């Protein structure tokens, strides 16, 4: 139940909070630096928690299928046949070792790193290229969504989530032709960013040596 509660707090609630922060400049016409920093802090928590949530769901399914009471296992825990205890770590462990263990289910392929950078760049297009609404609002919104999608996909169990950026890339290509307010440079950069996202999204990127049971087949 602790993992489930943590997943609810870090998953849906964080995504909703990030969404409201994303639309803030569009709704009120100004940026809030503290709000953006808060959104970044919340966003970075998501990929580090997803593998634990997937493991919890898998355990509950497998344990229930073998006839064990669902709610008893949910609140009090249980063990699958043949399972073993994980490695222990002392409280005085080196910070580097703690960070390494925390990031076991997270990898950052260069394709997703560049995708995140493109998203961040698009969020600043209004200031850099002097774009005006409605294109400036579109670039900010899509850029924030691209950044959020790429960072969530750093979690290996959520790697297929990156395919959402294909839709965002297609919109970036179309947006300058259907929305006004863009400068020539800003519109051109938006189109090129969309094309780049299409190419960057297709490769899965590197994986580490970790395996996630039956979830491995979904990591494409």
Predicted features and spans:
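Compositionally biased, low-hydrophobicity segments enriched in charged and small polar residues
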Residues: 2-11, 97, 134, 138, ...
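Secretory/periplasmic and organellar redox-cofactor proteins
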Residues: 1-113, 118-120, 124-125, 200-220
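Extracellular/lumenal glycan-associated surfaces
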Residues: 111-131, 145-146, 150-153, 165-182, ...
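Membrane-helix boundary connector in multi-pass membrane proteins
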Residues: 23-30, 174-191
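Cytoplasmic-side transmembrane-helix entry/capping segments in multi-pass membrane proteins
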Residues: 3-7, 139, 160-170
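Short, recurring structural edge motifs at helix starts
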Residues: 100-112, 133-134, 151-161, 185
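Structural signature of hydrophobic alpha-helical transmembrane segments
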Residues: 130-143, 188-191
């Amino acid at each position: 139940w602790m993992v489930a509660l943590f997943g609810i707090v870090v998953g849906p609630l964080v995504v909703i909070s990030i969404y409201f922060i994303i639309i803030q400049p569009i709704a009120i016409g100004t940026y809030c630096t503290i709000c953006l920093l808060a959104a970044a802090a919340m966003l970075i928590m998501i990929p580090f928690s997803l593998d634990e949530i997937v493991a919890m769901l898998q355990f509950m399914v497998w344990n229930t299928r073998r006839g064990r009471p669902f709610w008893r296992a949910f609140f009090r825990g249980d063990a699958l046949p043949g399972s073993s205890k994980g490695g222990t770590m002392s409280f005085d462990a080196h910070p580097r070792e703690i960070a390494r263990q925390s990031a076991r289910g997270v990898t950052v392929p260069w394709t997703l790193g560049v995708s995140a950078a493109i998203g961040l760049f698009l969020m600043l297009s209004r200031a850099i290229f002097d774009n005006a609404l409605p294109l400036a609002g579109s670039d900010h919104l899509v850029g924030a969504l691209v950044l959020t999608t790429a960072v969530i996909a750093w979690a290996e169990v959520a790697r297929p989530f990156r395919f959402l950026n294909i839709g965002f890339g297609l919109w970036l290509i179309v947006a300058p032709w259907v929305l006004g307010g863009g400068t020539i440079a800003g519109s051109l950069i938006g189109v090129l960013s969309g094309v780049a996202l299409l190419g960057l999204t297709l490769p899965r990127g590197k994986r580490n040596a970790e395996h996630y049971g039956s979830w491995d087949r979904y990591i494409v």
